[in-house]
Amino acid sequence: MSEVKLGLGLSTGMFYHAPKGTALPTDPTAAIPSTWKEVGDVSDAGITLATSKTVTNLRNWANAIKRVIMTEHSETIQAPIMDTTEESLKTVVGEANVSKANGVVTVNLSDGELPPEEAFLWVMKDGDDMMMIGCTQGQVSAVDNVSFAPGAAINWTPTITAMGDDGFKLIMKEATGATGATGAS
């Protein structure tokens, strides 16, 4: 088994969302509970986890740092969704901004409100090793510019900010007896 992991999306489902507060699955090899709805495929750019910490240096009278305290911490994931579906659009702009009637989906792209908080989950596979990263409380806080061009997939790239005390969690299960990573199945 290799300590170097590849962040390859699972071919049978990569990105899921569920109501805010839904518990994250505890075993990456088990079936995803039905409370989680599949959002769609993530592009080959993969997901990007970013953490940010703001600190304050406490100094004594001689201007020597005596203590460093964290004043702010944030975690975000950017996930370029390459599926343009009713479910992916509900995730990006909020369910209230997506309607469907007679097979026609209409999306309000101009709403100035953020979508409601949800739970989010991404599933990855590297050979027989499985990983998930997710949060029980997160919110789409931004969406990158969307290009509509011939010969290229339309990617909806939300930035999801983890909220509350839990933040994002990485859950990993390594295959027993594996000798190395072989790529996605």
List each model region and its residues.
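Oligomerization/assembly interface segments of phage tail-like spikes and tubes
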Residues: R67-L89, G151-D166
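Beta-strand-rich interaction surfaces with strong enrichment in secreted/lumenal proteins
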Residues: A64-R67, W122, V146-F148
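Polar/acidic, low-complexity leader/linker segments enriched in S/T/G and N/D
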Residues: M1-D41, T176-A184
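A generic structural signal for short beta-strands and their flanking turns/coil linkers
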Residues: A45, T71-I77, G103, P116-E118
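Short, solvent-exposed beta-alpha or beta-beta edge segments that form flexible loop/patches at the rim
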Residues: A50-Q78
